From Swiss-Prot:
Pfam families: Mito_carr (PF00153). One of its GO terms (biological process) is positive regulation of stem cell differentiation. This is Mitochondrial carrier homolog 2. The modification N-acetylalanine is found at residue 2. The gene is MTCH2. It comes from Homo sapiens. Belongs to the mitochondrial carrier (TC 2.A.29) family. Its main location: mitochondrion. Keywords: Acetylation, Membrane, Mitochondrion, Mitochondrion outer membrane, Repeat, Transmembrane, Transmembrane helix, Transport.
Length: 303
């Protein structure tokens, strides 16, 4: 119980601290660029046309809504984080209890020790089920979080309170509205998990010397590196999921010119791939100008 409480508190603290970063990231993913491109230098020192980074973007939001505005969508995100942690922990606890029951079963037969690869498959499968259950239950809060952020673009107030947002989504879209963008999110989580654990197993088994005294430390580093690599490869699923969660929901940020109306998440994927925007929002610094993007300054000139 104490471990669960500490995980919830730690997760909530990290959620609060990272909220401004996620807010900026979501607006960039949707394609909202309120600040015009500038001439800057990339990491190699070459002069390029690039978009303002995280701090300039956050400063722009704060200049309109104040610093408190950077924490828009925090309440549903906290609810999602707390509920997800509890569900994830309960599912894993169920598996642990079933393992203990098998060990203490009648006859107390000694089981064969499974190979390390079988162990990886078993643990990854359990983690996948736990994460998927948590994602499925918390996705409605995730949708509300994204929409409350995206309404900054059109200065709407459609998704302000948690209860009001739930009523609005149910009234306009029904139950399915709470699960907009769920499929690519689940696929991305599952692929990322299996890719991360499989790569970590291969590195730990064939690349690291088991005789090294710092073996456990090296394994933790390899897990972190493979996790980062897996998240980079599966980022398009995150982008598509977030875009589908806000697409055609009655907000300016989910409609043209910021976002086309997608018929499905596959349609969204194909269109982003065609435009070369599959990594949009992945980097918050040294941001290159995306293809075919309309800026706020351009829109003002057209009005």
């Amino acid at each position: 119980m104490a471990d669960a409480a500490s995980q919830v508190l730690l997760g909530s603290g990290l959620t609060i601290l990272s909220q401004p970063l996620m807010y900026v990231k979501v607006l960039i993913q949707v394609g909202y660029e309120p600040l015009p491109p500038t001439i800057g230098r990339n990491i190699f020192g070459r002069q390029v046309c690039q978009l303002p980074g995280l701090f300039s973007y956050a400063q722009h939001i704060a200049s309109i809504d104040g610093r408190r505005g950077l924490f828009t969508g925090l309440t549903p995100r906290l609810c999602s984080g707390v509920l997800g942690t509890v569900v994830h922990g309960k599912v894993l606890q169920h598996y642990q209890e079933s393992d203990k029951g098998e060990e203490l079963g009648p006859g107390n037969v000694q089981k064969e020790v499974s190979s390390s690869f079988d162990h990886v498959i078993k643990e990854t499968t359990r983690e996948m089920i736990a994460r998927s259950a948590a994602t499925l239950i918390t996705h409605p809060f995730h949708v509300i979080t994204l929409r409350s952020m995206v309404q900054f673009i059109g200065r709407e107030s459609k998704y302000c309170g948690l209860c009001d947002s739930i009523i609005t989504i149910y009234r306009e879209e029904g139950i399915l509205g709470f699960f907009a963008g769920l499929v690519p999110r689940l696929l991305g989580d599952i692929l990322s998990l299996w890719l991360c654990n499989s790569l970590a197993y291969l590195v730990n088994t064939y690349a690291l010397d088991s005789g090294v005294s710092t073996m456990n430390e090296m394994k933790s580093y390899s897990q972190a590196v493979t996790g980062f690599f897996a998240s980079m490869l599966t980022y398009p699923f995150v982008l598509v999921s977030n875009l589908m969660a806000v697409n055609n929901c009655g907000l300016a940020g989910g409609c043209p010119p910021y976002s086309p109306i997608y018929t499905s998440w596959i349609d969204c994927w194909c269109m982003l791939q065609k435009e070369g925007n599959m990594s949009r929002g992945n980097s918050l610094f040294f941001r290159k100008v995306p293809f075919g993007k309309t800026y706020c300054c351009d829109l003002k000139m057209l009005i």
